[in-house]
Regions:
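Short, polar/acidic, helix-capping and beta-turn segments at strand->helix junctions
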Residues: 2-5, 19-162
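Bacterial N-terminal signal peptides
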Residues: 4-16
Length: 162
């Protein structure tokens, strides 16, 4: 019993500290704005977080070859696959994304973009912007997406001094 009490006493501050450090993400759609579909108008992140900025991802595979030339569905799938890999490299997932900027050369293909987004993000609705552009970095590319994610800052372990 005494050991259990000692362990509880020692762990209590750690657990309280861990809870206090968790970021809070609040998604709001003000009634004064139109109802969004697949995104949120306002995303607030408070608390100690690590912010991750993902550069614009395009439809290139790991070897640098274009995937789905002329096929928005295939390009959108590759772009979201690349985003997933980039997020994972930073210890994040799509549920941590708070902002996405999407650039397309063909707005008439928006449904293919939405379908891929919905497959990867599910119910996650980050603040989002979608813009049609004349062209991207290479003429065969049809879609580029950048993302910002917020994840809890990991507690730093400091080695004990001797």
């Amino acid at each position: 019993m005494r050991i259990a009490m000692t362990v509880a006493f020692l762990l209590f501050p750690v657990l309280v500290f861990a809870q206090a450090r968790a970021p809070q993400v609040k998604r709001t759609n003000p009634p004064a704005l139109s109802k969004p579909t697949g995104y949120t108008h306002v995303v607030e992140v408070t608390g100690p977080v690590k912010t991750i900025y993902i550069s614009g991802q395009i439809a290139l595979d790991a070897a640098g070859s274009v995937v789905g030339q002329g096929d928005m569905k295939a390009q959108a799938e590759q772009v979201f696959k690349n985003l997933e890999a980039a997020l994972a490299a930073a210890g994040a997932k799509f549920g941590d994304v708070v902002k996405m900027n999407m650039y397309t050369t063909d707005m008439s293909q928006i449904q293919a973009i939405r379908d891929a987004r919905n497959r990867y993000l599910g119910d996650v609705t980050p603040a989002s912007t979608l813009v049609q552009v004349v062209h991207l970095a290479r003429p065969e590319l049809m879609l580029e997406i950048e993302a910002i994610a917020a994840v809890p800052e990991r507690a730093r372990v400091v080695p004990a001094s001797r």
